[in-house]
Amino acid sequence: MEKRNDCTDRKRWATLKSERIVSRPPWLSVRCDEVQLPDGRVIPEYYVLEYPDWINVIAITEEGLFVMERQFRYGLGRTCYEIPAGVMEKGETPEEAARRELEEETGYVGGTWTEIATLSGNATSMNNLSHSFLAVDVKPNGNVHLDATEDLEVKLLTRDEVYALLLNDEIKQSLMAAPLWRYFALGGLGKK
């Protein structure tokens, strides 16, 4: 399938003034810009959330099981099913970050890796991208290293169980549901 990118700079907005109003690196910054549209109109306050890029991984074991996580998400106030995910650290490529996060959160490593999507959570007001990978034939190595704020349970689910989670709207994070839907829409990308 040929990649197509219609996100061009054909009609860029001009930044007239910019002020950082919240700065909490590396997690979040909030910027307030004064911008001018191509037709000359000026928007005096346009807010942008600045985040580092994110990654997530559809990881499938040699036995064809999906490596999933369940964890409480404070923002939603509920426990959610998710695919392994995290933040890219400075100097990492998306794949390096994805491999690191998969191992840190689940203890799974190896396999064959393919980047299957690069998405924006909200291109209107967020500056980062989320890089989604498919990792096939991953194996456990037992080296889990959770961050201080992580409290998760690793679950191995069948293809049908993951598909049912999607159909029943049980995967709440859109940047995790989207690559899973893509995986299933493309027939499992020919894998497992």
Language-model segments: residues:
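Extreme N-terminal tail/first-helix region
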Residues: 1-25
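Short, positively charged
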Residues: 7-8, 13-14, 34-40, 138
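Acidic, metal-coordinating catalytic segment for phosphate/diphosphate chemistry
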Residues: 18-56, 62
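Short beta-strand micro-motifs in enzyme catalytic cores
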Residues: 29-33, 79, 129-131, 153
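A glycine-rich, hydrophobic loop/mini-helix early in the fold
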Residues: 51-78, 82
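Charged phosphate-binding loop/patch that engages nucleotide di/tri-phosphates or the phosphate backbone
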Residues: 176-192
